[in-house]
Structures are given as C-alpha cells and as structure tokens.
C-alpha cells in the first residue's frame, strides 16, 4: 500500500490530538493506574548517490512519520504504531519493481504505509514477555537489529522473553516473520520462517561477556538460512583521565534448512579504543570469513549500515568473505545555547578473506547536532574501488525529532 503526504498528516494528527495538559511525550493519566503514552517521531532526509557506472545520480528527499500510542495498566501494556514514508522527489531507484527508475542509483526508501508495531507486553521488574510485531535490537545490532538508518524500520512478528538474575541476563525470541526496510509494495518486504534468537550475558566489574545463538530457517529466503553460534566480550578500563575500551567477538556459521549452499564460515572481530576529554580514537579488524570461496559469513538481519562502511557496498558478504580493517577518530563538544556536536571520521580498508583480493577503501565523515528532542546530521561516504564494485559517493542531510 503506497503512502502519501496526506497519510503522514493523518498519522501525525491522530497522535497529537490526545487530551491536553500533558507535555509532548509525557504519558497521560486516563484512570487510576492507567496511562496513555503518545508516540510521535518524524525524520526527514536528503540523500544523494553517485556511482562510476552508467546510472544517473540519485537525488532523494524522503520523510517518515511513526505515530501511535502505548496504553499501560499495572504490569501490562498495549502498543500500536503506524509508519508512513513518502517520497518528496522521484529522481532515485526506490527498489520497487516497475518503478520506471532503474536508470538511477538506488536509495532504498520507498513510499510505504504499514503497521510498524502492534504488541502486548507484561513486565515485572527485570522480567518481561512481549508478543506481537515488535522492535528487536540485540547487542550492537551486528546480527539482529531494526535497520534504524533506513526510513522504513525492520520489525519482527515474535514472542520475546527477557529476565535478569543478579549479574546474569537472559533473552530468548521466536519470530515467525520479519518485515524488512523495502516496503509493503516490494516482493522483499516480508520473509516468514522459524527464527530463534538466544542471547545471554554476564556483567563483570569492568565489562560484560555475552554468548549467543541465532538460528534462521526461512521459508523462501533460503540462501539466508543459517545457524550462528558465538561469544563476545567488552571491557572498559579507566587509566587516569583516559578510558580504554576493548571488544572481541568470535562466531561460527553454517547452512541450515533449505539453503542450497553447504558451508561453514567464521566471524572474528577485535576493536581497541580510547576516550579522553570527549576525544575518541580507535582501530580494529572485522572478518566475515569464507568457506573456500563458496560462501561468506552473512548477517541478513543486522543493521548493516553501521558496519563495513556507510557506502553500503557490503550489505551482502562476498563469497570470498570480507576483512574490514578500520580506524576512527571523533570529538564531542557542547555549543553554548545550541546543543551537543558530535564529529566522527572513519577509514576502512577492505580485503577478501579467501584469495587475497583487494576490494578497495572508504572514508566516512559525520557531523551531528543534538538539541533537546531534535537532532541534525550530515554524513559523507566515499568508496574507492580496487577490483570490486565501482567508486561510490554518498551524502546525507537529515533532521529528526521524537517524543
């Protein structure tokens, strides 16, 4: 179902026409122990894409509204949220078949109108159970996330249970379907199957150790069916005015279900960083391995934009695998009377895991400003090809406000 600016306005009005006397974003008391919490978020983004191949540059201006409510009484709650995305320009390929725009580069933000979340939940202290269409983000979203960067959010039809016993936390989910970022008009919008997410962690004085198992058996997305088992550790160590950070992850993945390719591949990640007086420095290596060039380690449910470069050249791991060697530097500072500025620069070198192939390198730059509930963001990514894909440049301007 396609959205329009009128859909956006209707959703916004429905959320904002709540009883008065409550500040934006504050729960509204309806009765003794019963509250209504309006949900409203608006994101407007301008994105350009230039590729060194015979395609017209993409020039996309899109807007997204998420609007709804959460009704709570005691330990129980009901949450309903709609999502509408509209295209304010059409000079880009939105990935929808038959759109007549295949001569443009891709910006995967099609017009869309959908029920984004519809869930009931029970919570008692550190324990909770959530049933329905919901947002799921596990750890840093490297394996399971909501793809928050794109306009259409990725959500799951699932039952999820969480609890904590002292320093130990447990998280288990069974999902029967995932709604992707491609919108309701796309054949790639919804994938059903038997999806199991198991995640458990132990908090330590200076960090946390986590074990996980992600079992993905899709009904039709067969080449994404896999079993992944792994562990990760993250630690922080203050040394005078400097805080040192270290992260490491090890995982193994193999085919399952109807996957037509039999393979086993490993995942390795190591990251060292330091912060001092709002300065950030860090470097690391992430390797999505290959099984002899037959297939690479895949993370089909991840928030992929956050990893392996913002130019999105590696949303699917090549069959020869991927080794991403990266370094980053950043700085946060407050501007009096304005807000908090966040600057970040990242360099990536990309190589294969199998076959000693160079893929290229990339520079990513970001500048953000947070002002109360609003945020403003400018980003730039420049990928320089070396035997893989083509030179690609992307630029974004974005503003967002949420209540």
In which residue ranges do the predicted regions lie?
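Sequence/structural signature of outer-membrane beta-barrel proteins
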Residues: 45-51, 87-89, 136-147, 175-184, ...
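Extracellular/periplasmic loop regions
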Residues: 93-108, 245-346
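Outer-membrane beta-barrel translocator/channel fold
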Residues: 177-183, 207, 215-220, 242-270, ...
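Outer membrane beta-barrel transmembrane domains
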Residues: 192-222, 228-235, 306-317, 324, ...
């Amino acid at each position: 179902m396609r959205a329009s600016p009128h859909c956006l306005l209707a959703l916004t009005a429905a959320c904002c026409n709540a009883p008065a006397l409550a500040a934006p974003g504050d729960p509204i008391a309806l009765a003794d122990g019963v509250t209504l919490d309006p949900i409203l978020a608006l994101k407007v983004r301008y994105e350009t894409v230039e590729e060194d191949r015979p395609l017209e540059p993409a020039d996309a201006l899109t807007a997204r509204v998420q609007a709804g409510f959460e009704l709570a009484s005691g330990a129980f709650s009901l949450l309903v949220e709609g999502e509408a995305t509209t295209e304010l320009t059409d000079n880009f390929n939105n990935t929808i078949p038959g759109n007549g725009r295949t001569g443009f580069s891709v910006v995967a933000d099609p017009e869309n109108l959908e029920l984004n979340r519809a869930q009931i939940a029970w919570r008692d202290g550190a324990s909770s159970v959530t049933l329905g269409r919901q947002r799921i983000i596990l750890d840093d979203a490297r394996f399971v996330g909501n793809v928050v960067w794109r306009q259409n959010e990725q959500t799951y039809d699932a039952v999820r249970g969480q609890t904590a016993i002292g320093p130990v936390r447990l998280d288990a989910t069974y999902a029967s379907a995932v709604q992707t970022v491609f919108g309701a008009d796309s054949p790639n919008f919804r994938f059903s199957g038997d999806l199991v997410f198991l995640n458990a962690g132990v908090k330590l004085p200076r960090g946390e150790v986590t074990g996980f198992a992600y079992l993905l058996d899709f009904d039709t997305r067969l080449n994404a069916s896999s079993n992944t088992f792994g562990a990760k550790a993250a630690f922080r160590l203050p040394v005078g005015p400097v805080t040192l950070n270290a992260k490491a992850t090890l995982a193994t993945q193999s085919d399952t279900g109807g996957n037509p390719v039999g393979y086993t591949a490993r995942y390795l990640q190591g990251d060292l960083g330091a912060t001092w007086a709002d300065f950030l420095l860090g470097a690391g290596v992430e390797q999505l391995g290959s099984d002899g060039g037959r297939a690479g380690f895949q993370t089909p449910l991840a928030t992929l934009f956050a990893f392996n470069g913002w130019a999105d050249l590696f949303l699917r791991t090549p069959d020869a695998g991927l080794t991403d060697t990266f370094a980053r530097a950043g700085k946060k500072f407050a501007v009096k009377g304005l807000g908090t500025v966040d600057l970040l620069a990242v360099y990536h070198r990309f190589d294969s895991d199998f076959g000693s192939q160079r893929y290229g390198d990339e520079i990513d730059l970001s500048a953000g400003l947070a002002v109360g509930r609003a945020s403003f963001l400018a980003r730039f990514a420049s990928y320089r090809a070396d035997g893989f894909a083509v030179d690609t440049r992307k630029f974004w301007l974005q503003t967002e406000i949420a209540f």
